[in-house]
Each structure stands twice: as C-alpha cells, then as structure tokens.
Amino acid sequence: MKTAHEIRPGNVIMLDGSPWVVQKTETTRSGRNAAIVKLKLKNVLLDSGTEQTFKGEDKLDDIILERLDCTYSYFADPMYVFMDEEYNQYDVEADNLGDAADYIIDGMEDVCQVTFYEGKAISVELPVHIVREVIYTEPSARGDTSGKVMKPATITGGGTVTVADFVKVGDKIEIDTRTGEFKKRV
C-alpha cells in the first residue's frame, strides 16, 4: 500500500476491483488542509479513463506487477516499442503513456521500466530525472530580475517545461519526470 502522495505516473493501482494505470498526478497543497492529489487514470481492462481525487495520506493499493528494464526503440503509430537487454520487443499504447510521451525521443538511452499485466505491456515508468535539449524558448526579458523569473520552453520530444529565465535554445536541462518541473541546466 502506498499513500496517494507516493503514487507516480506509470504505477498501476487497484481501484473498485479493477487495475488502473496512473497517467498523470497533480498535487495541490494549501496552508490549512492536507495535500490533495488528483490522479488521471486509465482502466487496463475496459480501456476507459477517469480522474480521481484523494487526500495525500489516503492509502491506495499499488499492484506489484512484472516490470522489466527496457530502452525506447521506435514509434509505430499508435504504439511505442521498447526493447529489453535480450532484444525482446514490447508494444505500449500511446494512450497508456500519458505525459511521459513528451519525454520520449529517438535515440534516448534512458532505461525505462515497462510494466506488464497478464502478459501485456500496459505502462512505462521513466527515470525520475532526465536530460533534454531546449529547442525553443523566448529570449530573456532584459531587466526583469524581480524574484524567480520563469518562462515556457519546448524540449526535444515536443513537451513544454517552465524553465528559469537564463535558459536558452540549445541548452540541456534536467527535468523531474514525476512533476514535469525544470531542475537545473546541465
């Protein structure tokens, strides 16, 4: 059992007797109340989706499934194909990746964990931190130095990340895949 706060994209939880793949997590904290965790879920059996809200300390049944370390191989619409160290290939539906698809790029060497349910690859869990190149961002705003200045940037893979004002096109940045937050320039 994990708390709702410990659940991250790629995990599979049992809810109402069915396995659900966590596609996205969003944690909201308020000064007075406990953290609220909103999960975007996809039912493995019925292929339907939903959003559920939990308190941060709520216990959820995290299903322990078979997981394999794999690397991304290629995209064959609508499947992402991953390969293990023995060159076995596993297809994962693009819908099951959620926001993780924004971080998957050709030639990436990051080792991902592919999760299986009843012999079928159902989700992919990315490493906690990955490095990607910024392919587009606005130039820094001159003189705007009051506080922590942030701006949107597009990274290889097509995802958008909010980065510090000093980041330029061509910079490599480290991203936390659990939250989608910029960590540092590499």
Curated annotation (Swiss-Prot):
Keyword Cytoplasm: yes
Main location: cytoplasm
Pfam family, one: Elong-fact-P_C
Subcellular location: Cytoplasm
Record keywords: Cytoplasm, Elongation factor, Protein biosynthesis
One term of GO molecular function: translation elongation factor activity
CC per GO annotation: cytoplasm
Gene3D superfamilies, A to Z: 2.30.30.30, Nucleic acid-binding proteins (2.40.50.140)
Pathway it works in: Protein biosynthesis; polypeptide chain elongation
Gene Ontology biological-process annotations: peptide biosynthetic process
InterPro entries assigned to the protein according to its UniProt record, in alphabetical order: Elong-fact-P_C, NA-bd_OB-fold, Rib_uL2_dom2, Transl_elong_fac_P/YeiP, Transl_elong_KOW-like, Transl_elong_P/YeiP_cen, Transl_elongation_fac_P, Translation_prot_SH3-like_sf
Signal peptide start-end: none
Domain of life: Bacteria
Protein function: Involved in peptide bond synthesis. Stimulates efficient translation and peptide-bond synthesis on native or reconstituted 70S ribosomes in vitro. Probably functions indirectly by altering the affinity of the ribosome for aminoacyl-tRNA, thus increasing their reactivity as acceptors for peptidyl transferase.
Family, as annotated: Belongs to the elongation factor P family.
Protein name: Elongation factor P
